[in-house]
Structures are given as structure tokens and as C-alpha cells.
């Protein structure tokens, strides 16, 4: 434990001295103000908090764009964590003949002014990571990301759109490229 504490303190000392060296023109109060703004949840975090609760989900997945979708139903439990800074969603639903559990962690980075989403589930060992911006006109968060496709043996690009329809209804859509065209791979409707 003592060794871990020493390593952590050494890291903080290095990171802090590096940060201070880059900002020699700022006094400590100015730097603290910037850090406080960075760490304080704001309007985008309040928007994420509207997802908190238990949701019923109906998922449609297209394995082939010319075929009928596979439909499944499940539940999602959503909560804000770490002082209202992050949205954690745990989804449970059947997919491809097995019970699936997936976790989504959504953040809004005050510094970069962008959303970040991380998805993991028991259907693989990889992590899907995407970043996005809020589109005021469509009231949607539009993400672009990468995930590993084990069949292709490489990362593939995807786009997803998350939109609150009302306080008790939201929709998530995921798109991929197929023969040079954007096609819908998944649509999930959430209600509570």
C-alpha cells in the first residue's frame, strides 16, 4: 500500500509540475477556476440526468439490410454516478440466443465540449468508443466511433444517434456502411 501511495504521489507531482510549467502566466487562483469549471457538471450533464430510471427497451437488429430485423425486448437501469458527472446504463436483453448484458458509460467533457460513450457487453471482449456533439436542431447526440468486428478482423466505423423524444421515451439508432451506403444496423426504442 505504501508503495502504491508513493507512486501515486510521484505521478501527481510530475503531472502537476508539467501543468504548472505550461501555464506559467497563470496564478494559482486562475488555474483553480479553470479546474473548477472543468469538474463542475453543467447543462449537458443535466440533460443526461433525464435518462435516470428504469426503462423498457425494444431492440431491432438487422444482420442483413435486406432481411427482417431480429426483435428483442429487455430493460435498462440508468443512474448518474460520481457526483452527477457520468451516466451509467445497464441493459439486459436476449440477443442471438443468449441473455445479453451491456454497460454504457456516457460523459460530457466540459473541456472538449463533446460527449464520449463507452460500451461493453458479454457478447465480446472489446470496447466500443465513440465521441459526439449535441445537435440542437434535431435534439440529438450524434456519435462517431469504432468497434472491433471479429469476422472482418479489424476495427469498423459506426455512427449512432441518441434522442430524447419526451421525458418517458427515447430512441437510439446505429448505422454502418454497407456497399458504400449508410445502413441502419440497430434501432432501440426506450419507454418508461
Task: Label the model's feature ranges.
Residues 22-192:
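Hydrophobic small-molecule pocket/channel-lining residues, especially in calycin-type beta-barrels
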Amino acid at each position: 500500500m505504501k508503495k502504491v501511495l508513493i507512486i501515486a504521489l510521484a505521478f501527481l507531482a510530475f503531472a502537476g509540475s508539467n501543468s504548472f510549467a505550461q501555464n506559467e502566466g497563470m496564478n494559482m487562483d486562475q488555474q483553480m477556476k479553470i479546474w473548477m469549471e472543468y469538474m463542475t457538471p453543467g447543462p449537458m450533464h443535466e440533460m443526461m440526468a433525464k435518462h435516470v430510471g428504469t426503462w423498457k427497451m425494444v431492440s431491432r437488429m438487422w444482420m442483413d439490410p435486406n432481411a427482417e430485423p431480429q426483435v428483442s425486448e429487455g430493460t435498462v437501469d440508468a443512474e448518474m454516478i460520481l457526483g452527477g458527472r457520468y451516466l451509467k446504463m445497464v441493459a439486459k436483453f436476449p440477443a442471438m440466443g443468449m441473455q445479453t448484458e451491456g454497460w454504457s458509460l456516457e460523459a460530457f467533457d466540459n473541456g472538449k465540449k463533446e460527449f464520449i460513450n463507452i460500451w461493453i457487453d458479454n457478447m465480446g471482449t472489446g470496447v466500443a468508443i465513440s465521441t459526439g456533439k449535441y445537435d440542437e436542431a434535431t435534439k440529438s447526440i450524434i456519435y462517431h466511433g469504432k468497434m472491433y468486428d471479429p469476422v472482418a478482423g479489424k476495427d469498423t466505423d459506426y455512427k449512432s444517434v441518441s434522442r430524447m423524444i419526451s421525458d418517458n421515451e427515447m430512441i437510439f439508432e446505429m448505422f454502418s456502411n454497407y456497399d458504400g451506403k449508410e445502413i441502419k444496423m440497430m434501432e432501440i426504442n426506450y419507454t418508461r
